[in-house]
Amino acid sequence: MLCFIVNEHSRSGKGAKIWKEAEAVLKKKNIAYESYVTQYEGHAFSLAHDICECGADDIQLVVVGGDGTANEVINGMTHFEKVRFGVIPTGSGNDLARGLGITGTPTEVIGHILNCREDYVMDLGQVSWNGCEKPRLFAISAGAGLDALVCKKALKSKVKDALNKLHLGKLTYLFLTVQSLFCLLYTSDAAD
């Protein structure tokens, strides 16, 4: 069963365009697939969970989105031994895809996914903290402090949207880091 979880809003809407390119390849090759478009934050988690719980023995689960969408999908997955995971990168950073060596046009990436006969093991990390209901998985990195603050701000940043439209999305993180450094409150327990 070939399933796609699509975040059309990734990279300020470029995800929808990239998905159309990938979908055209699937239709041209007459490949059977199911696609699910995310509607809200956290939806990719639910979709991945439901797909993995459907009872199929061989699931090919492909994310069309950025690192955030991929993270949601990985955390929603169950029965990992039955799932082959892939990603068509459409985000502004695409650290996961880069780390996995995924490069090329959407057409090239979908071609590789369809023709790949070899499985690769992907390491995942797990983190939990006080008040955490369930440990979270991560594929690339986990941050705390300033790093986590910048990533959280980037999720809702109008600056990110504007820079993505100018094809400068990676500068979002530099801008938000500098901005956050000037807004942090510093405390010291040291005596004066």
Description of each model-found segment:
Residues M1-L61, N71, N75, E108-I110:
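ATP/NTP phosphate-donor binding region
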Residues C3, H79-R84, G91-S188:
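Catalytic core of DAGKc-family lipid kinases
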Residues E8, V64-G66, T90:
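Glycine-rich beta-strand-to-loop/alpha-helix junction loops that act as flexible
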Residues Y36-T38, I88, V127:
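Conserved beta-strand termini and adjacent loop/short-helix elements that scaffold enzyme active sites
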Residues G68, E72, L149:
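Active-site phosphate/pyrophosphate-handling residues
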